[in-house]
Amino acid sequence: MAPRKEVMSKRVLDVGNCGPDFGSMVRFLTKNFDCQVDQAHGPEDTLEKLRGGDYALVLVNRKLDQDYSDGSEILKQIKADPALQNTPVMIITNHAEHQDAAEALGAERGFGKLEFGDPATVEKLEKFLR
């Protein structure tokens, strides 16, 4: 019998969600995927975690919980860093115009919190988390 190959769960970095929203995100993701979800709150801890870990996906809230600043600023910093620029990033927002703006900055098309549990959202995440 061939040795069993251990499959490592994918890592997701969730940025800028308050405690209750982070909990909802973790439940949604772990229900649908074998993944570990870490939390960051702003640019400094986000970049530090990304440089120290291997993340399959970064989910950035459109408005950060710590100071209500624009999450697209973190997206810009990730995409400007040669070591991180290929890391897939999605903006979490229910507003199509903000999804469009994030895509123009190099993000993958994200989803909003109202879309948790939607089969289309799960399908969108599969290419990063399966």
Give the residues covered by each predicted segment.
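Alpha4 helix (beta4-alpha4-beta5 surface) of REC/receiver domains from two-component response regulators
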Residues: D70, N94-F111, E115
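C-terminal output helix
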Residues: E115-L125
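Short acidic, S/G/P-rich loop/turn micro-motifs used as interaction or catalytic elements
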Residues: C18-F22, K63-Y68, A96, F116
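Conserved phosphotransfer microenvironments
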Residues: L59-I78
